[in-house]
From Swiss-Prot:
Residues under site feature: Required for activity: 363
Subunit structure: F-type ATPases have 2 components, CF(1) - the catalytic core - and CF(0) - the membrane proton channel. CF(1) has five subunits: alpha(3), beta(3), gamma(1), delta(1), epsilon(1). CF(0) has four main subunits: a, b, b' and c.
Keywords of the record: ATP synthesis, ATP-binding, CF(1), Chloroplast, Hydrogen ion transport, Ion transport, Membrane, Nucleotide-binding, Plastid, Thylakoid, Translocase, Transport
A GO CC annotation given for this chain: chloroplast thylakoid membrane
This enzyme's EC code(s): 7.1.2.2
SUPFAM superfamilies recorded: C-terminal domain of alpha and beta subunits of F1 ATP synthase (SSF47917), N-terminal domain of alpha and beta subunits of F1 ATP synthase (SSF50615), P-loop containing nucleoside triphosphate hydrolases (SSF52540)
Binding residue positions for ATP: 170-177
Annotated protein name in UniProt: ATP synthase subunit alpha, chloroplastic
Reaction(s) this enzyme catalyzes, per UniProt: ATP + H2O + 4 H(+)(in) = ADP + phosphate + 5 H(+)(out)
Tagged with keyword ATP-binding: yes
Function: Produces ATP from ADP in the presence of a proton gradient across the membrane. The alpha chain is a regulatory subunit.
Recorded family membership: Belongs to the ATPase alpha/beta chains family.
Length: 507
């Protein structure tokens, strides 16, 4: 039988006492009172902060949004199906943040910046808060560089600048997403990082957009943040802020970024759902009172950084869906008042075959010609006014039987101008090609052609110019000005191509 040696036992006890470190850990905890519909009510959590992350016993994360006298309203970042009444919840002391890095380029992630494209984890050593304060007045400078969309109607008449917020608004199925995705495709080789945020869309639609980007090599400089229609309302509400945090990471590294929110109507609906379930008082159209702040704090993060901060930029292109063209509804008017202009897409124009279906009359860019190169200003200066006058005249001409020659000529010119603004989807044009197209139309070179021949002629003219007069493109690219030499080259090319085209049409 082994003997117990008292000195050994006392040595072991002494060692243990010497190694013992007293650690007091205070955890702010609470108990689940009620859970359901993506909302949990918690008793306790006395020192929780508004917007703080809380962790449930089974691992689900939530955000404390409602701090009431006897309970805390938490929105869940997941389905919460395994959370039970009476289970414990602890406050984490953190607010929502995501990892950020260059490795996110070319990836599809969710609102928590977790990859959902099946290509493994994304390496990141840095974190950014999902909700960051917008840059102040001193940190910004006015918008002066163009962000080319590749769409003639926009770049010539409703120009978008780097750091601007330009709303794309219209009914469903009018080509809003097409305008946004074409803008991303046109950034190839322009050193612009693009972020596409899909909120509450069908998974098939998001897959189609991603496939389009991959086929055209746009995923190299694009990040897609997607929360589809079956995602919890909390994640649909967070997705735009996640996209903004990713874009800001590049903006503060002196890079140019462009972010598309597709669409903010769905984010507002998700926020309305959360607010009503949290029993916040409803306002107009049952939206909560702070729905304006929901969008303003998001869109104010888009900026053109000052030269002290490296002149990076974040251009926001939010999309809002209207019902039967009603731009005076609550969410459309809110977002119109926050942004620096809007591109209005009309269902009537879309159905009439005018695509992109941009209503030039009520679309506007509050940055204006500051966001255009000099060459574009020179050729496109009057085109918006001419088109608006034509639309008015066309409406009047429906009731007039006999029109004078000048009016007939103006109508004929207007129809050809409208024709040259038509573009197929995913076929953006370079600036020099746009200058060629607009100059040809506004100077009457298309007046001798039938309307049906306009598109074909312009395609041939652009090809002819590229092949036979490459110096035209060089002048526009290097000087950004429509010089006399460039004009002479273009006039010569138009005359040569027009003669050739008419000859081919006769044979």
């Amino acid at each position: 039988m082994a003997t117990l040696r008292a000195d050994e036992i006392s040595n072991i006890i002494r060692e243990r006492i010497e190694q013992y470190t007293r650690e007091v850990k205070v955890v702010n905890t609470g108990t689940v009172l009620q859970v359901g519909d993506g909302i949990a009510r918690i008793h306790g959590l006395d020192e929780v902060m508004a917007g703080e992350l809380v962790e449930f016993e089974e691992g689900t994360i939530g955000i404390a949004l409602n701090l009431e006298s006897n309970n805390v309203g938490v929105v869940l970042m997941g389905d919460g199906l395994t959370i039970q009444e009476g289970s414990s919840v602890k406050a984490t002391g953190r607010i929502a943040q995501i990892p950020v890095s260059e490795a996110y380029l070319g990836r599809v992630v969710n609102a928590l910046a977790k990859p959902i494209d099946g290509r493994g984890e994304i390496a990141a050593s840095e974190f950014r808060l999902i909700e960051s304060p917008a840059p102040g007045i001193i940190s910004r400078r006015s918008v002066y560089e163009p962000l080319q969309t590749g769409l003639i109607a926009i770049d010539s008449m409703i120009p978008v600048g780097r750091g601007q917020r330009e709303l794309i608004i219209g009914d469903r199925q009018t080509g809003k997403t097409a305008v946004a995705t074409d803008t991303i495709l046109n950034q190839k080789g322009q050193n612009v990082i693009c972020v596409y945020v899909a909120i509450g869309q069908k998974a098939s639609s998001v897959a189609q957009v991603v496939t389009n980007f991959q086929e055209r090599g746009a995923m190299e400089y694009t990040i897609v943040v997607a929360e589809t229609a079956d995602s919890p309302a909390t994640l649909q509400y967070l997705a735009p802020y996640t996209g903004a945090a990713l874009a800001e990471y590049f903006m503060y590294r002196e890079r140019h970024t462009s972010i598309i929110y597709d669409d903010l109507s769905k984010q507002a609906q998700a926020y309305r759902q959360m607010s009503l379930l949290l029993r916040r008082p409803p306002g107009r159209e049952a939206y909560p009172g702070d729905v304006f702040y929901l969008h303003s704090r998001l869109l104010e993060r888009a900026a053109k950084s000052s030269s002290r901060l490296g002149e990076g930029s974040m251009t926001a292109l939010p999309i809002v869906e209207t019902q039967s063209g009603d731009v005076s509804a609550y969410i459309p008017t809110n977002v119109i008042s926050i942004t620096d202009g809007q591109i209005f897409l009309s269902a009537d124009l879309f159905n009439a075959g005018i695509r992109p279906a941009i209503n030039v009359g009520i679309s506007v860019s509050r940055v204006g010609s500051a966001a255009q190169i000099k060459a574009m200003k020179q050729v496109a200066g009057k085109s918006k006014l001419e088109l608006a006058q034509f639309a008015e005249l066309e409406a009047f001409a429906q009731f007039a039987s006999d029109l004078d020659k000048a009016t007939q000529n103006q109508l004929a010119r207007g129809k050809r101008l409208r024709e040259l603004l038509k573009q197929s989807q995913s076929e953006p044009l370079a600036v020099d090609e746009q200058v060629v197209t607009i100059y040809t139309g506004t100077n009457g070179y298309l007046d001798t052609l039938e309307i049906g021949q306009v598109k074909e002629f312009l395609v041939k003219l652009r090809t002819y110019l590229k092949k036979n007069k490459p110096q035209f493109q060089e002048i526009i690219s290097s000087t950004k000005t429509f010089t006399e030499e460039a004009e002479a080259l273009l006039k010569e090319a138009i005359q040569e191509q027009l003669e050739l085209f008419l000859l081919q049409e006769q044979t």
